[in-house]
Amino acid sequence: MSGPAQVPMMSPNGSVPPIYVPPGYAPQVIEDNGVRRVVVVPQAPEFHPGGHTVLHRSPHPPLPGFIPVPTMMPPPPRHMYSPVTGAGDMTTQYMPQYQSSQVYGDVDAHSTHGRSNFRDERSSKTYERLQKKLKDRQGTQKDKMSSPPSSPQKCPSPINEHNGLIKGQNAGGINTGSAKIKSGKGKGGTQVDTEIEEKDEETKAFEALLSNIVKPVASDIQARTVVLTWSPPSSLINGETDESSVPELYGYEVLISSTGKDGKYKSVYIGEETNITLNDLKPATDYHAKVQAEYNSIKGTPSEAEIFTTLSCEPDIPNPPRIANRTKNSLTLQWKAPSDNGSKIQNFVLEWDEGKGNGEFYQCYMGSQKQFKITKLSPAMGCKFRLSARNDYGTSGFSEEVLYYTSGCAPSMPASPVLTKAGITWLSLQWSKPSGTPSDEGISYILEMEEETSGYGFKPKYDGEDLAYTVKNLRRSTKYKFKVIAYNSEGKSNPSEVVEFTTCPDKPGIPVKPSVKGKIHSHSFKITWDPPKDNGGAAINKYVVEMAEGSNGNKWEMIYSGATREHLCDRLNPGCFYRLRVYCISDGGQSAVSESLLVQTPAVPPGPCLPPRLQGRPKAKEIQLRWGPPLVDGGSPISCYSVEMSPIEKDEPREVYQGSEVECTVSSLLPGKTYSFRLRAANKMGFGPFSEKCDITTAPGPPDQCKPPQVTCRSATCAQVNWEVPLSNGTDVTEYRLEWGGVEGSMQICYCGPGLNYEIKGLSPATTYYCRVQALSVVGAGPFSEVVACVTPPSVPGIVTCLQEISDDEIENPHYSPSTCLAISWEKPCDHGSEILAYSIDSGDKQSLTVGKVTSYIINNLQPDTTYRIRIQALNSLGAGPFSHVIKLKTKPLPPDPPRLECVAFSHQNLKLKWGEGTPKTLSTDSIQYHLQMEDKNGRFVSLYRGPCHTYKVQRLNESTSYKFCIQACNEAGEGPVSQEYIFTTPKSVPAALKAPKIEKVNDHICEITWECLQPMKGDPVIYSLQVMLGKDSEFKQIYKGPDSSFRYSSLQLNCEYRFRVCAIRQCQDSLGHQDLVGPYSTTVLFISQRTEPPASTNRDTVESTRTRRALSDEQCAAVNLVLFAFFSILIAFIIQYFVIK
């Protein structure tokens, strides 16, 4: 490649896809008229102007699928980043590094394979600086991570960003031209480069933190499920950790592969949990699982792979059997084996319904073959079949049921099809089975159709087993001929007789919008219309005209129905809007309605109104009139009303109201005088005639306003109110209304009668009250008096409410004991004008307890497990208030004492502890709970167990080590005291069992025995003990004891059986002296000594070889043991299945 080369690229999301660039070349992204081109040009040589930053190339070759673009690239916004899916794609591992904010930085090609050991001194310092900055930016970190960092203020060339890639025509020349453009601004440019490089190092350090994650742990492995658990990335750097700078919540992505450790991985989980359950796995399959950490769009390197294998299970459900051959009396079926799921399929089970069709299946074949022939069947007989497979783990489910028929005879000629329903473009036909056909025989039908005018003859329209079919896409009002043919696997029948059916005509088209013919009058006008362009294939029978009153009226009424195309609309109202529309009817149906025509008749002046009427009762100085609109508005809305008034004794009318309202108030009248009123209405055409006159007489006036009442408080709950008689205005006062209340604007009537005083009881002490009075006569009610305020004197406090017990969790008093104390709280009652000084608590004792101005108190010196009745009252300077309601509280019993702790079983790694009296498995509902603790390396006691059981097994201990334990009992009364410290010591472990020794014959009387050698156990030497048992002896004898791993036995006798075994002995030296810990013996090896003779003939060699083979090797012994173990396991499983489960 000698010069630039253009590479056309297509991307579905608008971003530039990754490409591979040869060494020595660099890509440039150029945009021209909205089209991006990637130009590959030779890499420009490095340019080092004085005082400027040098752009270095990466010392490593480009990674596959990675674009070595210029490093001056801002990071993409967080909302535009999307992680690449696909488990095995290389871009998934390297894309987070490519999209991080690497400005003037090198690409680290080793970051995807390292762990915490790969960091150098510079990365460690950068990580410490990152931890410091994360603390300072803890409040605004999410806002900063969601937006791209700001560009330097003195950037020489415009660079646009699109999905993390550089966009612009000048983007390709950054490496070669940036030094010249920044000439004269070296100081500012160097500062910006340092800040961006620092951000790049922080990102790398954070990626290193996310990469420090261990592989997941697989547990609860089943045939199709597994549980994966992992821990967050470790924050340990150079032996130190800072938990304050580590994020509280990570994101994780779990990748699995079933094609090997280096196979293709796929993503199965993305979230924030640290344990998941994987479902839908393949049984008996090896899987590799990895986990990858992510935080704020930065991903770490995936962990090492965890390898696990799913369990085996019963086979998958097989596919239905398929038919291989059929005759009139037999069916031959074949099938394929499904997945065996880790265990070889032993048998296939084929069931059938014997052709009865009642849903009951019977076994017809069971074996390892994959085909079977069913014989002795009847012609045209239908049978259902299903198949299952069986292996060592069980039987699979049955396959789908399939129905197969034996061969039969061709059907007879069917009857002609019958028309069930006809439409405009379709015809529904129905036919029946040929006569003499069995009901269960599978017969198909061919429906053929011929159009009268097409000239193509009959063509098939349907081929299937149904007895009905709807032929669609036909023409309206057209005749069609039909016939039906029946067939089966044996042949076709003769066609049925031809029948002819006709489709229905279509409804006609929309008529033309009607129009007005002639002049529009106030009460009538004439309309006309044209017929529709499409009559639907049939003549128009009649037209229907509908009319709706109003410009937006939707209540249509039929006003005409006939064959003519014009109509006179009469008996209309003046000035009204009318909407008219028309539709037509033919044999094909009714057409849609036409567009509506809007017509308005001319208006006239309104008609006379009814006389105005009195609204309510007449008052002394004013009356209120009300009227309705005229019966005839003249076709135009009423815009104005005019009311005239004149005294009854003289005819001098004057206008007292003109407006659009339908009521008015006439004031400045004289009480007890008669007046005449008349009314007229007007619209846009003018005023109409006056109505008839209406005579109305004014009424006498109500009493005047009362003077303010006088209030006298007789006690804290009683007050006396007095008032005077006001002016009556010509009528006597019949009664007075007194309003009383605690709020000035919300008073209620408390008295209504003729009296001039009233006594009010049931008041609250030290409370402000308001009152006013009103006089009434037969005429009406006068205005209320002015409001008067009064204050009642103070009294004893009110009753105490909300008396309740305080829970133990809310008490912070260190001297509180739930067995001898009760804590209560209450709400402060109303003091009734005098401050509350104390409270008196009555708990049933002879003397009550008085406390200060508090709302909670702890009652001490009580008896454990005792019920008390408690009530309380408040006290002030005026006396004691009433007692509150009584509550029953009970003290708790005393906490239990700790039990004695014992060690009932021990080994070099386990200690089984027991305490108290009870069964090992105690129910969780026991009232007493136990808390077992053990001392750790720092001398602190940590919790081992908390629960109701009386035993606990401590595991994963060190041999020959002393451990300290203590125990504590607790119940609903609280936690009891901690017991004394108990010290238990684990013994030393014995050596492991050795493999069976190997025996080599030296001569007729000497053989050499060798065995495996063990390493010293924690500094203790290991020796070996070799034993032999001769012939039919019942006991072994020791022939060697020492540190060697071989021994020559020289006391062999000819034609004798020898059994050898060996064990390891650990020699311990402790404070008690020398001690030997003997391990288990190895497997016994049989050896038969025989005389060695020269070969005489072929037969003799064969006999000698047979005798020599009697000594079993290690592999043969292991095979024999495995077979015996499998036999006994199957036998025990069968016994449990038969006697226990059934």
From Swiss-Prot:
It is found in: Golgi apparatus membrane. InterPro entries: E3_ligase_FN3/SPRY (IPR050617), FN3_dom (IPR003961), FN3_sf (IPR036116), Ig-like_fold (IPR013783). Residues 107-145 have a biased composition (Basic and acidic residues). The modification Phosphoserine is found at S147, S151, S157. The modification N6-acetyllysine is found at K328. SUPFAM superfamilies: Fibronectin type III. Keywords: Acetylation, Golgi apparatus, Membrane, Phosphoprotein, Repeat, Transmembrane, Transmembrane helix. Gene3D superfamilies: Immunoglobulins. Residues 104-191 are annotated as: Disordered. Pfam families: fn3. The chain crosses the membrane at residues 1121-1141. Residues 146-158 have a biased composition (Low complexity). Belongs to the FNDC3 family. Mediates spermatid-Sertoli adhesion during spermatogenesis. This is Fibronectin type-III domain-containing protein 3A. The lineage of its organism: Eukaryota, Metazoa, Chordata, Craniata, Vertebrata.
